């Protein structure tokens, strides 16, 4: 397995697909990286030469934020919003959807498991 940006990418897949295993790289960015490195997108990772792997590593490390750096930046951005207590920060603090989604009947995964309220009884008709 080739190691790029501290991630083992699979050998038996095409280069474009393998690069998407790196956090922060989608299919569009992977294709863009292949074009910059002048490597065919359809080439399998196991047939890449050492020189091609080195050029891929250099392009990814120097021009893109991936893996730990990207995760750290996202976490710091969320923390900053929480600290200044803007609307999105308050939604993060309350563990509610941030981008305007409905919460009346949905958002179970974001809100967590439903909690029973003590002392509240259902009325029988």
UniProtKB/Swiss-Prot annotation:
Pfam families per record: Ribosomal_S13
GO molecular function: rRNA binding; structural constituent of ribosome; tRNA binding
GO terms under biological process: translation
RNA-binding found in the keyword field: yes
Matches recorded under InterPro entries: Rbsml_uS13_C, Ribosomal_uS13, Ribosomal_uS13-like_H2TH, Ribosomal_uS13_bac-type, Ribosomal_uS13_CS
Key words, A-Z: Ribonucleoprotein, Ribosomal protein, RNA-binding, rRNA-binding, tRNA-binding
Gene Ontology CC annotation, any one: cytosol
Signal peptide (residue range): none
Keyword rRNA-binding attributed: yes
Function: Located at the top of the head of the 30S subunit, it contacts several helices of the 16S rRNA. In the 70S ribosome it contacts the 23S rRNA (bridge B1a) and protein L5 of the 50S subunit (bridge B1b), connecting the 2 subunits; these bridges are implicated in subunit movement. Contacts the tRNAs in the A and P-sites.
Protein family: Belongs to the universal ribosomal protein uS13 family.
NCBIfam families, sorted: uS13_bact (TIGR03631)
Assembly mode: Part of the 30S ribosomal subunit. Forms a loose heterodimer with protein S19. Forms two bridges to the 50S subunit in the 70S ribosome.
Name this protein carries in UniProt: Small ribosomal subunit protein uS13
Gene field: rpsM
């Amino acid at each position: 397995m080739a190691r790029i940006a501290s991630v083992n990418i699979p050998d038996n897949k095409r280069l474009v697909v393998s690069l998407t295993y790196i956090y922060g790289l989608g299919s569009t960015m992977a294709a863009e990286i292949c074009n910059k490195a002048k490597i065919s997108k359809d080439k399998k990772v196991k047939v890449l030469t050492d020189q091609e792997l080195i050029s891929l590593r250099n392009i990814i490390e120097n021009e893109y934020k991936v893996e730990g750096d990207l995760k750290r930046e996202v976490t710091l951005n969320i923390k900053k919003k929480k600290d200044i207590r803007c609307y999105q920060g308050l939604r993060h603090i309350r563990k509610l959807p941030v981008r305007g989604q409905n919460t009346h009947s949905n958002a179970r995964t974001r809100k967590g498991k439903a909690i029973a309220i003590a002392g509240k009884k259902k009325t029988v008709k």
